C-alpha cells in the first residue's frame, strides 16, 4: 500500500487540525510534504519540526500578491498527490486554481472557491485531469450519496443545518447577541468567521450556492432543514421515491479522510452510531424570516452571474466588522443585502474578473458598515 504525499494549506486552522489528526493516526498512509499557514508562526514551526518539514509557508505578514506567489512556489515544489485547501474565505480561490493545474486531488474545504468561481474550477480540473473532492461534511455526504446512487437518480438534495447557537432565539433576542455568544457553536469547533456564519445561517446559504454550482443541480432541487444533532449530514431523494441519508458522528476528520484516500475506500476510523441506545433524530424547517441570509443564499444561487461573489464578499466584510464590534449581529444581514442591491449581472470569465467583483462588493459593504457605525 503506497503512502500518499499530502500538502495542507491552512494548517494552523480548524481544517488543518483535523488533517493533522489523520496524519498522526495513519503515518503508514500519509506523508506531509508541504504546508501553509497564515498566522501562529511559532505553532507552525513546531509542526514543521514534528513532521520533518524544512519550513511551513506563512502568508500572514506579507502582501496578498506575495502570499499568492509563496503558495504557488510551495505547490510547484512538493509533488503532492493530494492537497487539502483549508484556507479561509475568498483568499482560498487562488490556491484551488493552482492546485488544479496539477493532476493531484484537491480535497476542498474552502467552499468559497466554488461559490466564487465554480466554472473556473471545473474547467481547470477538466484541462489537467485533476479531481475535486469536497470536504464540507454536507457536500462530502452528497458526493458519496450521488456516487452510490447515480446523479440521474437524484430528484432532490437536502442539506442539514444545526441551526447554530441561536436556533430558538426570538428576533428580539437576536438583536442583543454578542460576539462571545456567536462564537459558541453547539456542535462544531471552528474558527471565528465560520462560527459567526453558522450563527447567522450564512454558512448554510454558502453551502446552498456551493451545492448548486459544484453538483450542477437547479436551486429548486435543493432544500435545507434544521437538524440540531448534526448526525445526518445530507439526504438525497430519488425519482423513485426513496430517500437516502449519510449519518455519522459530527467530526470533520471523517469527510477529510474520505477525500485524502479517494477513490480508495477509507479504513475504519469512527465508532459507528449505536441505534440501540435510544438515538433520536429531529428535523424542523429553518426560520428564514429571522435568519434572512439563508433566503438570500437561495436567491443568489438562482441569480448566479456575479451575485454569489458579491454575497460572499459582503458577508465576509460584515462578519469582520461584527467581530471588531463595529456593527451588531443583525447588521450582518443588512450589510450583505445592501451590497446585493448593486448590479452584479456581469459574468466573470477569469480569476482577475472574479477578484475585481470581489473588491467592488467589499467596497460596497464597507460603505454600508461605515454608515451603520455613524448611526449607532
From Swiss-Prot:
Keyword tags? Isoprene biosynthesis, Manganese, Metal-binding, NADP, Oxidoreductase
Could you tell me what reaction this enzyme catalyses? 2-C-methyl-D-erythritol 4-phosphate + NADP(+) = 1-deoxy-D-xylulose 5-phosphate + NADPH + H(+)
Q: Which residues bind NADPH?
A: 12-15, 39-40, 110, 112, 191
Q: Which pathway does it take part in?
A: Isoprenoid biosynthesis; isopentenyl diphosphate biosynthesis via DXP pathway; isopentenyl diphosphate from 1-deoxy-D-xylulose 5-phosphate: step 1/6
The chain's disulfide connectivity reads none
Q: Name one GO biological process term.
A: isopentenyl diphosphate biosynthetic process, methylerythritol 4-phosphate pathway involved in terpenoid biosynthetic process
User: Which cofactor does this sequence's record say it needs?
Assistant: Mg(2+); Mn(2+)
User: Which residues are listed for 1-deoxy-D-xylulose 5-phosphate binding in this entry?
Assistant: 111, 137-138, 162, 185, 198, 203-204, 207
Which SUPFAM superfamilies does its entry note? 1-deoxy-D-xylulose-5-phosphate reductoisomerase, C-terminal domain (SSF69055), Glyceraldehyde-3-phosphate dehydrogenase-like, C-terminal domain (SSF55347), NAD(P)-binding Rossmann-fold domains (SSF51735)
Which family does the similarity line name? Belongs to the DXR family.
Biological role stated in the UniProt entry: Catalyzes the NADPH-dependent rearrangement and reduction of 1-deoxy-D-xylulose-5-phosphate (DXP) to 2-C-methyl-D-erythritol 4-phosphate (MEP).
Q: Return the HAMAP family for the record.
A: DXP_reductoisom (MF_00183)
PANTHER family (UniProt xref) = 1-DEOXY-D-XYLULOSE 5-PHOSPHATE REDUCTOISOMERASE, 1-DEOXY-D-XYLULOSE 5-PHOSPHATE REDUCTOISOMERASE, CHLOROPLASTIC
Name of the molecule in the record: 1-deoxy-D-xylulose 5-phosphate reductoisomerase
- Organism the protein comes from: Treponema pallidum (strain Nichols)
Amino acid at each position: 500500500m503506497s503512502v500518499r504525499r499530502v500538502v495542507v494549506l491552512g494548517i494552523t486552522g480548524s481544517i488543518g487540525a483535523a488533517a493533522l489528526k489523520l496524519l498522526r493516526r495513519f503515518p503508514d498512509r500519509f506523508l506531509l510534504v508541504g504546508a501553509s499557514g497564515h498566522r501562529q508562526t511559532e505553532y507552525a514551526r513546531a509542526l514543521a519540526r514534528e513532521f520533518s518539514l524544512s519550513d511551513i509557508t506563512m502568508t500572514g505578514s506579507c502582501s496578498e500578491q506575495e502570499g499568492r506567489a509563496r503558495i504557488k512556489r510551495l505547490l510547484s515544489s512538493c509533488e503532492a498527490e493530494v492537497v487539502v485547501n483549508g484556507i479561509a474565505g475568498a483568499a482560498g480561490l487562488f490556491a484551488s486554481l493552482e492546485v488544479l493545474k496539477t493532476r493531484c486531488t484537491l480535497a476542498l474545504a474552502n467552499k468559497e472557491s466554488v461559490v466564487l468561481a465554480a466554472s473556473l474550477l471545473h474547467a481547470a480540473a477538466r484541462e489537467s485531469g485533476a479531481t475535486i473532492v469536497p470536504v464540507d461534511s454536507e457536500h462530502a455526504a452528497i458526493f458519496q450519496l450521488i456516487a452510490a446512487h447515480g446523479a440521474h437518480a437524484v430528484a432532490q438534495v437536502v442539506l442539514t443545518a444545526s441551526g447554530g447557537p441561536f436556533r430558538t432565539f426570538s428576533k428580539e433576542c437576536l438583536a442583543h447577541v454578542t460576539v462571545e455568544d456567536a462564537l459558541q457553536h453547539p456542535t462544531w469547533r471552528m474558527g471565528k468567521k465560520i462560527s459567526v456564519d453558522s450563527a447567522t445561517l450564512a454558512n448554510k446559504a454558502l453551502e446552498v450556492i456551493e451545492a448548486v454550482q459544484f453538483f450542477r443541480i437547479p436551486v429548486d432541487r435543493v432544500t435545507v432543514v434544521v437538524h440540531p444533532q448534526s448526525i445526518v449530514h445530507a439526504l438525497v431523494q430519488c425519482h423513485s421515491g426513496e430517500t437516502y441519508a449519510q449519518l455519522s458522528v459530527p467530526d470533520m476528520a471523517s469527510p477529510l479522510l474520505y477525500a485524502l484516500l479517494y477513490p480508495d475506500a477509507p479504513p475504519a476510523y469512527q465508532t459507528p452510531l449505536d441505534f440501540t441506545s435510544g438515538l433520536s433524530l429531529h428535523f424542523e424547517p429553518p426560520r428564514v424570516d429571522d435568519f434572512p441570509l439563508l433566503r438570500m443564499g437561495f436567491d443568489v444561487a438562482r441569480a448566479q452571474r456575479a451575485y454569489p461573489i458579491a454575497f460572499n464578499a459582503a458577508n465576509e466584510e460584515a462578519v469582520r466588522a461584527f467581530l471588531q464590534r463595529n456593527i451588531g449581529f443583525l447588521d450582518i444581514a443588512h450589510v450583505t443585502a445592501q451590497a446585493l442591491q448593486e448590479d452584479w449581472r456581469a459574468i466573470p470569465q477569469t480569476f482577475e474578473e472574479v477578484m475585481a467583483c470581489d473588491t467592488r462588493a467589499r467596497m460596497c459593504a464597507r460603505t454600508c458598515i461605515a454608515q451603520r457605525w455613524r448611526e449607532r
